[in-house]
């Protein structure tokens, strides 16, 4: 797709990144860290578009917006995740881009805030008739189980992906529940969400476009079992290579019954629109032994690394340059460019 004309001569695309992902150069530019997701996306963009400039997001904001107006990009490819390390403020960046009239990739502030609040997101999905784990919320100091059977899965009500998710998130008794709640409170992670634990297969489904194509579900595989083997996707499992090697963690295309695959293909676009997602996203599910599908959470800003799900398997399971091209196209088409 050809990039649209812009009223101000400038670059084709600005790659907007967190300032911590690179360093300033002597000539006033910005160099992203070699091998980073930002570097991978930048390389893919430059293979297709003639002028792509990385710009760091400065917490003071004015410097960043001045750079964007000076460059006059036809599209901002938004890879930012936080302001001053605070992920809960990512929606402020998209609001700023909208206020200044820039077309950008990815979900708007409305969708970012909705998916971050796991209670509201689950309520929106449950309203579609899609199964979600039962839950209760805990704000106080004492663990009061609202009659859900153990084990329970306890995580912050608000947060990203595997943030604060460790083996301790799975609790089997009241005393373990109390320790988990105390730990979350000590780290100031806000109210806790206590869910019934759904035993089953972890499925990850990528969606591309705004009439979203539902791509082949991927499945988490833990090749080595035994005491201490991971039962769900923790932060350690996702980001620690030694841990992944120890437990032979990998991902594969999920071999699913036709009926389950049909359920996924029907449910995912509904969830995508209900949660105000845009351009691309990832939805996480659990599938029980009797093939009951449960929605777990949505990731409005999934990792776009080339190897997110293993060697040469990006989050969508498609060829990497094609993934980046389709995200650009989706954003431009959505914005009427």
Give the location of each predicted region.
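A short beta-strand motif that forms the metal-chelation/ATP-contact edge
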Residues: 13, 77, 153, 206-207, ...
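Phosphate-binding site of ATP-dependent enzymes
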Residues: 174-266, 289-294
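ATP-dependent carboxylate activation and anion-phosphoryl transfer catalytic cores
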Residues: 93, 124-126, 255-337
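Hydrophobic beta-strand scaffold residues
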Residues: 52, 103-104, 132, 152
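Active-site nucleotide/adenylate-binding loops and adjacent lid/helix of ATP-dependent enzymes
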Residues: 2, 6-17, 68-70, 112-201, ...
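Short acidic, glycine/proline-rich loop/turn micro-motifs
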Residues: 24-28, 163-166, 308-311
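ATP-binding N-terminal substructure of ATP-dependent carboxylate-amine bond-forming enzymes
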Residues: 1-103, 110, 140-144, 334-336
């Amino acid at each position: 797709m050809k990039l649209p004309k812009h009223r101000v001569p400038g670059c084709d695309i600005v790659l907007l990144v967190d300032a911590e992902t690179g360093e300033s150069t002597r000539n006033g530019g910005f160099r992203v860290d070699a091998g980073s997701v930002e570097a991978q996306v930048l390389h893919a963009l430059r293979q297709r578009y003639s002028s792509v400039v990385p710009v760091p997001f400065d917490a003071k904001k004015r410097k960043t917006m001045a750079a964007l107006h000076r460059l006059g990009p036809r599209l901002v490819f938004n890879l930012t995740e936080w302001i001053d390390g605070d992920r809960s403020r990512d929606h402020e960046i998209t609001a700023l881009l909208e206020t200044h009239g820039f077309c950008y990739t990815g979900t708007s502030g409305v969708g970012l805030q909705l998916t971050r609040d796991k209670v509201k997101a689950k309520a929106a999905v449950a309203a579609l008739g899609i199964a979600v784990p039962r839950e209760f919320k805990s704000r106080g100091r004492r663990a009061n189980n609202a009659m859900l059977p153990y084990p329970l899965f306890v995580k912050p009500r608000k947060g990203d992906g595997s943030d604060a998710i460790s083996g301790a998130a799975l609790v089997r008794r009241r005393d373990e529940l109390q320790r988990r709640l105390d730990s979350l409170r000590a780290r100031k992670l806000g109210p806790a969400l206590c869910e019934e634990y759904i035993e089953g297969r972890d499925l990850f489904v990528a969606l591309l476009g705004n009439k979203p194509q539902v791509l082949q579900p991927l499945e988490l595989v833990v090749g080595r079992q035994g005491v201490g083997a991971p039962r769900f996707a923790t932060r350690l499992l996702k980001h620690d290579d030694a841990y992944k090697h120890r437990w032979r963690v990998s991902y594969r295309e999920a071999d699913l019954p036709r009926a389950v695959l049909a359920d996924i293909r029907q449910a995912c676009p509904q969830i995508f629109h209900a949660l105000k997602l845009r351009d691309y996203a990832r939805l996480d599910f659990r599938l029980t032994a009797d093939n009951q599908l449960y929605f777990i959470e949505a990731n409005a800003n999934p990792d776009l690394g080339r190897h997110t799900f293993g060697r040469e398997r990006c989050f969508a399971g498609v060829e990497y340059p094609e993934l980046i091209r389709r995200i650009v196209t989706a954003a431009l088409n959505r914005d009427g460019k």
